[in-house]
A protein has these predicted regions:
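A conserved acidic, glycine/proline-rich C-terminal tail/linker
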Residues: 204-255
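Active-site histidine-anchored catalytic micro-motif
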Residues: 22, 46-52, 65-67, 78-81, ...
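N-terminal glycine-rich anion-binding loop in soluble enzyme alpha/beta folds
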Residues: 21-61
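Anionic-ligand-binding alpha/beta catalytic cores of soluble enzymes and soluble regulatory domains
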Residues: 138-207, 211-214
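N-terminal beta-loop-helix "entrance" segment that forms/cooperates
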Residues: 54-74
Length: 255
């Protein structure tokens, strides 16, 4: 027989539990191989109660800028202090540092290769360390799989409450790359740059709604094709026609 009282108690306890470990993963590993599963296994071996959320494992191989953008657009929607692991790491095994950092809303574990650039541009860095304390790594560290042997165990320990400062030596600066910015020409024309192309082929630009005055007189030009005005949805134009609109991230997009 179903026990309603027991069910209510379970929900209440779950809601009150503020110590649940929440960890996200973003990688370029794909899902055909064992890499993502191995990372999850390491995390669960340290914290069997951890909740692991996949943001994406379809980042183009070694595309640090794409990973930086994808994490930037996803992490604000997670609870504060979620630990976000980003492993797009063409320099694995080299002298590049492995780092963990705290920003205003979240914590991150990643290679120090610029993958945090968009996040830090939004909210800055409160604290950062180089992951030099091997106590929080796996006993044997592969030269080519720091995702499994350094980033995953560090994330699990961090989510369980190990202080950031205990993970390694403090850092005051980390690697970032210059972010594209829209350019406003003397005649009022705004020149934007493509930040990301999503899986539907939509172009996401660095231009935001506040960078120009909305109105029917807006003309956009892309690859020699002109778009008159802004739409609201994909169905505002016939099939095969381009439409420009403000997307869910607040950026100007072209579909």
């Amino acid at each position: 027989m179903f026990d309603c009282q027991q069910a209510r108690i379970g929900v209440q306890l779950g809601w009150r539990n503020s110590t649940v470990s929440l960890i996200t993963l973003t990688t370029d590993f794909g899902l055909a191989d064992s890499y993502v599963g191995a990372m999850k296994g390491v995390i669960l071996g340290i914290d069997p109660t951890a909740t692991i959320v996949d943001i994406s494992h379809d980042i183009a191989p070694q595309d640090v800028q794409e990973a930086a953008y994808v994490v930037y657009t996803a992490y604000p929607y997670f609870p504060p202090d979620t630990v976000h692991v980003v492993v797009v790491d063409p320099g694995v095994g080299s002298r590049r540092r492995a780092i963990a950092l705290r920003a205003a809303q979240a914590r991150f574990v990643a290679p120090d290769n610029g993958v945090m650039s968009y996040v830090l541009a939004r909210e800055g860095m409160k604290e950062a360390v180089s992951l030099t304390n091997s106590r929080y790594h796996r006993p044997t560290v592969s030269h080519t799989f720091h995702g499994r042997d350094i980033f995953a165990p560090v994330a699990a320990h961090l989510a369980r409450g190990v202080p950031l400062a205990e993970l390694g030596e403090p850092l005051t600066e980390i690697v970032t790359f210059p972010l594209p910015q829209p350019q406003v020409l003397p005649d009022g024309v705004v020149v934007g740059h493509v930040l990301h192309v999503d899986r539907f082929g939509n172009l996401i630009l660095d231009v935001r709604e506040g960078d120009f005055v909305l109105g029917g007189g807006i003309i956009l030009e892309v690859a020699g094709r002109r778009i008159q005005g802004l739409g609201r949805t994909f169905t505002d134009v016939p099939a095969g026609e381009l439409v420009a609109y403000i997307g869910s991230s607040g950026h100007l997009e072209i579909a």
